[in-house]
From Swiss-Prot:
This ferredoxin is encoded just downstream from the GGR gene in the genome of M.acetivorans. Pathway: Membrane lipid metabolism; glycerophospholipid metabolism. Residues 45-73, 74-102 form the 4Fe-4S ferredoxin-type domain. InterPro entries: 4Fe4S_Fe-S-bd, 4Fe4S_Fe_S_CS, Fe-S_Ferredoxin. Binds 2 [4Fe-4S] clusters. [4Fe-4S] cluster 2 binds at C64, C83, C86, C89. Signal peptide: none annotated. This is Ferredoxin. GO terms for biological process: glycerophospholipid metabolic process. [4Fe-4S] cluster 1 binds at C54, C57, C60, C93. Keywords: 4Fe-4S, Electron transport, Iron, Iron-sulfur, Metal-binding, Repeat, Transport. Its cofactor is [4Fe-4S] cluster. GO terms for molecular function: 4 iron, 4 sulfur cluster binding; metal ion binding; oxidoreductase activity.
Length: 102
């Protein structure tokens, strides 16, 4: 399950990192309203990253709608003031290193 962002449109796909595949196979739906996106994913409070599980692939950084995640050397940094707690990073992480808690 993958969220891709193009401007203000979120494309939800079932296959990891396969935007061309999603567009070709029509295995996605679009969410244009970020408030609706928050309703779909739930309102969340904190983002915890398990640095021992994280492979630093950058998948979470690429899908963050607010750019709150940054890959700095060998760490993922979360800007809590920018993060909207949507939980998309949690859902995209291929190794389950991110946990967004209520």
């Amino acid at each position: 399950m993958v969220w891709h962002y193009t401007n203000d449109v979120a494309l939800y796909c079932r296959a990891f990192r396969s935007m061309p595949h999603c567009l070709r196979e029509r295995q996605y739906f679009m969410v244009k309203d970020h408030d609706l996106l928050l309703k779909l994913t739930g309102e969340l409070v904190s983002v915890n990253i398990n640095r021992y599980k994280c492979g630093y692939c950058g998948a979470c950084v690429g899908v963050c709608p607010k750019g709150a995640l940054e890959l700095v050397e060998t760490w993922i940094e979360v800007d809590e003031s920018t993060c909207i707690k949507c939980g998309i990073c949690d859902r995209i992480c291929p190794v389950g290193a991110i946990e967004v808690m209520k």
